[in-house]
């Protein structure tokens, strides 16, 4: 891609009010396997393999919010509206009328209300870790988030901290950032050379 620096892949909103069943907002892998709504990994694969976007120009989107359904379980039917829930509203729900569950297919958590009336899919520090590892393994250009203000809790910015620990501290990531900075520097130097040549041409005329 010669005219675009990078693409921010919106690897979230995989499921929502338009779906025919309860599903994760941002499942790393399909849950259940083969779910036609797809997943983060199938989305990245489509952009890379089908659309031909280089992996190092793809940024993996990390959501700092979840989706709440009127339903009794993951992959079940639901009724009514699906409500977006910011991450900073979620930790206090755990063990306070809601039970934490982990989906081994999606590599994502979810909460079930104790009376089985609602389910909340979201990302936490653990699922963010898996997504960061995926971005590193696939040698993607980076990660991006939506949105900063959704992450602030009494324990600090927990999801940002997970990105810092599992992505920014990676040796592979540090090398990638160094390569990107070198590329930016080289492009800047090239632009300066072109500008100088253009100015000389004007003077010669």
What annotation goes with each model-predicted range?
Residues 35-42, 120-127, 155:
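Soluble or luminal CAZymes and related metallo-dependent hydrolases
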Residues 20-33, 102-104, 190-198:
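Short secondary-structure transition/capping segments
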Residues 67, 124-204:
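Acidic/aromatic/glycine-rich contiguous surface patches that form carbohydrate-binding/processing clefts
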Residues 10, 26-27, 63, 109-110, ...:
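Flexible, active-site-adjacent loop/turn segments at secondary-structure boundaries
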Residues 31-34, 115-125, 147-150:
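Active-site rim elements
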Residues 1-93:
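Substrate-binding surface in catalytic domains of secreted glycosidases
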Residues 83-140:
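Hydrophobic, secondary-structure "cap" segments at the distal end of domains
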């Amino acid at each position: 891609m010669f005219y675009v620096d990078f693409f921010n892949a919106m690897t979230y909103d995989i499921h929502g009010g338009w779906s025919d069943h309860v599903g994760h907002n941002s499942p790393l892998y399909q849950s259940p396997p083969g779910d036609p709504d797809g997943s983060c990994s199938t989305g990245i694969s489509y952009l890379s393999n089908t659309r031909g976007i280089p992996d190092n120009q793809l940024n993996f989107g990390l959501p700092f919010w979840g989706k709440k359904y009127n339903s009794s379980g993951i992959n079940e039917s639901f009724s009514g509206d699906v409500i977006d829930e910011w991450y900073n509203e979620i930790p206090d729900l755990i063990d306070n009328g809601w039970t934490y569950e982990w989906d081994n297919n999606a590599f994502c958590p979810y909460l079930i209300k104790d009376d089985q009336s609602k389910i909340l899919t979201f990302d936490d520090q653990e699922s963010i870790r898996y997504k960061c590892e995926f971005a590193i393994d696939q040698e993607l250009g980076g990660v991006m988030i939506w949105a900063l203000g959704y992450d602030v809790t009494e324990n600090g910015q927990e999801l940002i901290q997970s990105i810092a620990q599992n992505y920014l501290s990676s040796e592979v990531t540090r090398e990638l950032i160094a390569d990107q900075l070198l590329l930016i520097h080289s492009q800047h130097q090239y632009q300066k050379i072109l500008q100088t040549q253009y100015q000389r041409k004007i003077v010669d005329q």
